Amino acid sequence: ADWLPALGLRFSLRMDGFAWVLALIVTGIGFLVVLYARYYLSAADPMPRFFAFFLAFMASMLGVVLAGNLIQLVLFWELTSLFSFLLIGYWHHNPAAREGARMALIVTSAGGLALFAGVLLIGRIAGSYDLDRVLAAGDLIRADPLYLPALLLVVLGALTKSAQFPFHFWLPHAMAAPTPVSAYLHSAAMVKLGVILLMRLWPVLSGTDAWMFSVGLAGLVTFVLGAYAAMFQHDLKGLLAYSTISHLGLITVLLGLNSPLALVAAIFHLMNHATFKASLFMAAGAIDHESGTRDIRRLSGLVHSMPITATAAMVAAAAMAGVPLL
């Protein structure tokens, strides 16, 4: 449908195999988190406001993964920043929630502006913002003098959204959000958008030394630092937050290798991470709800008092550790 005819922009959906997989992750895990939130939130929490923000957040995610042109993608990209701000700060009486929400909004919105500038450069080189035409113009874009600034701006936007070094600091502060928000944010929602963007534009921007060093190096540093920081966390959600940073760093490293096989591995791990991280966050929320603490130094014997939750958490943790067949 015509969106901004004067600029030659059309509102369109791109329903290729990659988009279908992402849409299933966004809606499938979103549906499970909605069910979980129904029983997790207390009667004192304003549920209509929560579910309105959450469903709008989910719709914005779908808008990004199904976008048929780059301007449309950036619009929904910024909407995810807005609704994540409202969800992270849902318990606005908590100063930590307000601080985490502001930090997430500032970092990701600034990255969104960088992405917008990069998209404008890509559109100028390709002569169109339509994703089909952009993906077909990879050789033209890589040969253009504007390729390097466009690449750096797009990568900057992706790194801020996926909490990659040196922009990783906002994600642990977002753990002040309700657990359903954390589960969705880490597994199928906003922090995945950066690596999803790099995957979507991989045919256009990859294949150069600039791509390998800007993407691969940032991912490698994030992968190592995230894993190191996770070892010293005592809060369950904090530990999972840093593990998310590390896993996204691993995905980013794979994308930076300029290898089609590494791209396939990155997409597979994206799906795997979405599944086990949602499970682990919901298990952490159940443990906190029943025991009153997320401090792992004070938790023991859960396999006896919460056998179902403990079993689900162990299976998800085994998947995170890369145990075969999981």
Per-segment meaning from a language model:
Residues 32-48, 54-73, 82-326:
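Hydrophobic transmembrane alpha-helices and their helix-loop junctions in integral membrane proteins
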Residues 78:
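Short phosphate-coordinating micro-motif centered on Lys-Gly-acidic
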Residues 2-21, 137-151:
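Short aromatic-rich membrane-water interface segments that cap or initiate transmembrane helices
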Residues 14-31, 106-107:
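Membrane-interface loop-to-helix entry segments
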